[in-house]
Amino acid sequence: KGDNEATFARRIHDLFTVPQTCIVGYNNVRFDDEVTRNIFYRNFYDPYAWSWQHDNSRWDLLDVMRACYALRPEGIAWPENDEGLPSFRLEHLTVANGIEHQNAHDAMADVYATIAMAKLVKTRQPRLFDYLYSHRNKRKLATLIDVPQMKPLVHVSGMFGAARGNTSLVAPLAWHPENRNAVIMVDLAGDMAPLLELDADALRERLYTPRAELGDLPAAPIKLVHLNKCPVLAQANTLRPQDADRLGISIQRCLENAQLLRANPQVREKVVAVYAEAEPFVPSENVDAQLYN
């Protein structure tokens, strides 16, 4: 027999709000944490305070595993999917590394598997583990961002796709005009032509056109990085030459593109305009779904 949602929300809230608690999961930032926020909202608890108040924080092991594969893969077995690309499914990683994980997707089994994978990274790549853990909050991450110089950083994100290890060098072009937690980044491995040749309206259309519909047109090489969502960012030299080669990333091309951006500062104003005039947010009329209204 389970609890009703109000009781369940109170029990979870009591656990999550213990001071100096770090909530860790596997893809939790994009899924579990959104569920948590909405449950707390529906039951009259602050939907955000649990993740920052009283020195609390959150962290996501999925991007830790992606970063470990891309930047420091030694000591861990990396399984592949049917397409020959690295798989970061928790049940694949545990099997490849000899970790017991019966009943995958059973809540408790996944908790123990997540803890075991975290211990594995901590043991095999302790410096990377400690770096990522210490850079899980937006204040620490903000110290890496140098917008005026567009200083390149290495960024690991599922948005880049497994074919290049979810990794690229990026340059911070500008802060988002409305969201102070978001940085507009340029994917330096991409084609700079859309940024240089298109006006703001055409660039916005290119940005929001699905890749499958672009045909031979190059995608707009820009993405938002939300510093309050535990993104993986590090100094550019964290990406070793041998790992760049393994991932198919040309460091030389990335650095040349960074120079090209610095030589064309008008791109910054154009890209800010793209995000300043994005499609308006449509509020929900469902009272239980108005968290982000």
Where are these regions (language model features)?
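Acidic catalytic cores of enzymes that act on phosphate-bearing nucleotides/polynucleotides
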Residues: 134-214, 222
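Generic secondary-structure transition motif, activating predominantly at the C-termini of alpha-helices
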Residues: 16, 69-72, 98, 136-140, ...
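Conserved non-catalytic scaffold segment of RNase H-like nuclease domains
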Residues: 1-41, 45, 87, 91-97, ...
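Sequence-level motif detector for i,i+2 pairs with an aromatic at +2
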Residues: 56, 180-183, 228
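A broadly tuned preference for mixed-charge, low-complexity surface segments
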Residues: 73-92, 154-180, 235-249
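Metal-dependent phosphoesterase core characteristic of DEDDh/y 3'-5' exonuclease domains
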Residues: 1, 16-127, 132-135
